[in-house]
Amino acid sequence: VYPRGNGEDYKQIPNSKKEWEIAAYPLLLASLRTALGPSKRISAAVPGLPRDFRAFTPITIPEIMSSVDFLNIMTYDLMNRRDNVTKHHTGIQNSLEAIDAYLDRGVPPEKMNLGFAFYVKWFKTDADADCKTHPIGCKTALMEDPATGHDLGKAGAFSWHDEVPAELAASFDRALADGTYDSKGGGHYFFDVEEDLFWSWDTPDALTKKFPAIVEKKRLGGVFAWGLGEDAPRFEHLRAANGRVRRLVEEGKKNDGEARSEL
């Protein structure tokens, strides 16, 4: 749930009734800082979709940053059931859009951590859409009830340590075998023509591409992942990320002289 709305209950409690949270959120963080003192490290996980930045404005950002040490930018779930066309859920380009949006609002780059997703997402596409020819930007099935906001079961996610749902197992096998990397959007994906399913996830190789393209380019302070246990039992994504973090440390390219990765 994000400050100032767009949460699970946004159809029942409209954003207009949560306007008060815009001013309350910095006050909450300030109270935490006062209670914990200046020596404790405070971070906040914040949305990666600009449409959810309702409480993060050029006015509130300075107040927020005066109380926290850094922000964990959730650059994943950038496609969800409220979307109506396919896109990468944790791609390079939409991650850059999130980082740039926070930079434009006044967040120092060294105070931002880029988020990695240690899980897979899938979405049902419209059977009448030409997703085979245009898998990115293709029309999805209706994934959310327009009246209630409830999940219609046309999208989902699971972790690497999870058992793949039986009804998705064959499609996911095809995704693993034939998935491809979109060099334009910067994301790994697969479109299953047999079941009209769009798959979006990071391979270890796709994940490491984000270091030069985002972390180094924007001179960010670090990285984090959601979540550690979700990469079990092989921890391939964790090893890939840790390898790049160590490389940055060894090359002296981090900004603030202190490793702050949460991996």
Regions found by a protein language model. Name each.
Residues F116-A213, R239-E262:
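Glycan-binding loop/region signatures in secreted carbohydrate-active enzymes
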Residues Y2-P165:
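Substrate-binding surface in catalytic domains of secreted glycosidases
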